[in-house]
């Protein structure tokens, strides 16, 4: 990740995070996020910026669901920056943060299960996840016919 800076998101990053996530939401690859949601959950977000241009090139969030459960969500990397380790850096940092917080399990809903298997996530039935996690699904254009794959990582 040469020339890339990974850090916690700042209030000035919200609109850029919003634009990046919704770029992929328009392609039905991520759930859309409103500005209000991103402001409400700003502390969940990690970002990667290009050092020279300060361009936001990637983001990912660790959403806390319960005392022992968190979600890796809203992973997005600009296409021209993919396959450079940026997404991996973001996911690893979310995993590290979960460990620091004492969280025992992290899940994700994804279209790229092979990618998350690299970090130790394994496929599970969606029915194994608590009902609380499905609140966001109402915003999905594919609801109620979810085609994402549920995965979990035990820490």
Predicted regions and their residues:
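Glycine-rich acetyl-CoA-binding "A-motif" of GNAT/NAT acetyltransferases
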Residues: 52-58
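A short, internal acetyl-CoA/4′-phosphopantetheine-binding micro-motif in the GNAT/acyltransferase core
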Residues: 75-82, 111-112
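Helix-loop element at the rim of GNAT/NAT acetyltransferase active sites that forms part
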Residues: 8, 19-32
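Conserved active-site alpha-helix within GNAT-family acetyltransferase domains
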Residues: 104, 110-136
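Conserved acetyl-CoA-binding loop-helix of GNAT-fold acetyltransferases
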Residues: 83-96, 108
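C-terminal "cap" of GNAT-fold acetyltransferases
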Residues: 129-155
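A conserved beta-strand-loop-helix scaffold within acyl/acetyltransferase catalytic domains
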Residues: 32-45, 58-69, 74-75
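A short beta-loop-alpha structural element at the N-terminal edge
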Residues: 3-17
